[in-house]
A protein has these predicted regions:
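Polybasic, low-complexity association/targeting segments
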Residues: 1-8
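Conserved C-terminal portion of the radical SAM core fold
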Residues: 167-220
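Distinct, well-ordered alpha-helical segments
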Residues: 99-107, 128-138, 196-197
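Core AdoMet radical
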Residues: 57-73, 77, 81-101, 112-128, ...
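Broad gene-expression machinery/nucleic-acid interaction feature
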Residues: 37, 144, 182
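Acidic (Asp/Glu)-rich catalytic clusters
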Residues: 77-82, 109-114, 132-142, 173-180, ...
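Short amphipathic alpha-helical segment that frequently serves as the phosphate-/nucleotide-binding helix
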Residues: 37, 67-71, 103, 200, ...
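N-terminal pre-triad scaffold of radical SAM enzymes
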Residues: 10-61, 71, 78-89, 218
Length: 220
């Protein structure tokens, strides 16, 4: 962790009460239609996992944001995206990290997004537990969880400092599917420590493996 952090430049100052970005894109839905989909990029405390390939740390704070700040950010962003049918809540880390998003804010956000057809959250496989299904039930809508797989290369994945294994990812996927929650995966086209040729080969292998364990959608 310390070596990775030593390579980083200083963080910009962020307003804890405002999302650092939001956007609307037309995306293919599970039902086959192309729908306006909003993404809220939430400002919150930095993810504790310090992954080698992550550049999202620069959009985070060093300390936990005040109670109510995350819900206020979501409210602000949604007001600017009135026509969306689906929403992604991306927080440069893990939605179920209590230091990033408090249980109180998560509950408030659940009440706020229940009217959307789909809500997508991002989370580390090792933070997948019963809270995810509980949050889905509170929101009362379809929830997808997006997790960073990156690669299944047996030597490269440990070097990314994600502090997870492919088995961890598979177990988290199985837990989510058992709770009727769909899973998305992020896969690197060329992970570090690979040649271009190896990168393409292992990206394809990783996508195929992800689908084989139940992932519905892969982003590369």
């Amino acid at each position: 962790n310390s070596w990775i952090r030593s390579l980083r430049s200083p963080k910009p100052d962020l307003d804890a009460w405002k999302p650092y970005a939001f956007e609307v894109e037309d995306e293919l839905s599970r039902g086959g239609s192309v729908d306006p989909t909003g993404t809220v990029f939430i400002t919150n405390r930095e993810c504790p996992f310090t992954c080698l390939v992550c550049d999202l740390w620069q959009y985070t704070t060093d300390e936990s944001v005040p109670l109510g700040a995350v819900d206020a950010q979501v409210e602000t962003a949604l007001a600017m995206m009135p026509d969306i049918r689906h929403v992604k809540l991306y927080n440069a880390g893990n939605f179920f990290d209590d230091r990033a998003i408090t249980p109180e804010d998560r509950a408030a956000v659940a009440a706020r997004v229940g009217g959307f057809e789909t809500v997508v959250l991002e989370n580390h496989p090792n933070l997948v537990d019963d809270r995810v299904a509980g949050w889905r039930d509170t929101a009362g809508t379809n929830v997808d969880v997006a997790m960073g797989l990156e690669t299944i290369h047996p030597d490269v994945l440990p070097r990314l400092n994600k502090r997870m294994t492919a088995d961890d990812f598979e177990a988290a996927t199985a837990k989510l599917l058992a709770d009727d929650i769909s899973v998305r995966a992020f896969v690197l086209v060329r992970a570090p420590f690979m040649t271009d040729e190896e990168g393409v080969e292992w990206a394809c292998r990783s996508v195929e493996w992800a689908f084989s364990v139940g992932v519905e959608c892969c982003s590369v």
